[in-house]
């Protein structure tokens, strides 16, 4: 955990439903770390950790800032701090700015477009299994880590293309 706080750029992905977090993945460099909600690792501990990481890194790429901010608002009911606006980058918003006619921007599609990586979707891996049950399967941690890694690797590519299109001010 201390090592992650020293990273300048991170990818982070929460796994959860609207009201529940089952885990969180953080990507740094070529490594991914998955933290499940289990035993002493609680939702509050994970959101607190995400809060610390957002404060300590220069840039944090996430697949879905709306989900991230929803969980963080639950963690900080008094309001989300302004530093999120400095460090947080939503790759789905960046992908939308570059190609607004696509319609939907799941991280699997973004990874294929901006990193030439094929990621399986939740449906591909777990079918109609509810999230809480899927999170107990051995492949779930890799699934969430791949989402965080995709955000980390696609983020700079998207930012570069936005700069080339003179749209980076819209993204940041």
Go through each PLM region and give its residues.
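Mixed-charge, glycine-rich, non-catalytic linkers/tails in nucleic-acid processing enzymes
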Residues: 81, 120-172
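Aromatic side chains
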Residues: 33-34, 96, 114, 122, ...
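Conserved RNase H-like, two-metal-ion catalytic cores of nucleic-acid enzymes
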Residues: 1-113
């Amino acid at each position: 955990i201390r090592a992650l706080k020293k990273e300048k750029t991170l990818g982070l992905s929460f796994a959860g439903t609207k009201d529940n977090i089952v885990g969180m993945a953080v990507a740094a460099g070529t490594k991914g770390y998955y933290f499940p909600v289990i035993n002493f690792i609680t939702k509050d501990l994970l959101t607190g950790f995400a809060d610390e990481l957002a404060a300590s890194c220069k840039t944090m790429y996430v697949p879905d800032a709306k989900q991230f901010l929803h969980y963080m608002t639950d963690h900080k009911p008094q309001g989300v701090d302004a530093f999120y606006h400095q460090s947080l980058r939503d790759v789905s918003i960046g992908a939308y700015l570059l190609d607004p006619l696509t319609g939907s921007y799941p991280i699997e599609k973004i990874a294929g477009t901006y990193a030439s990586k094929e990621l399986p979707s939740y449906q591909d891996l777990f079918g109609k299994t509810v999230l809480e049950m899927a999170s107990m399967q051995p492949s779930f941690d890799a699934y969430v880590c791949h989402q965080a890694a995709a955000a980390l690797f696609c983020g700079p590519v998207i930012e570069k293309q936005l700069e080339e299109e003179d749209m980076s001010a819209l993204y940041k």
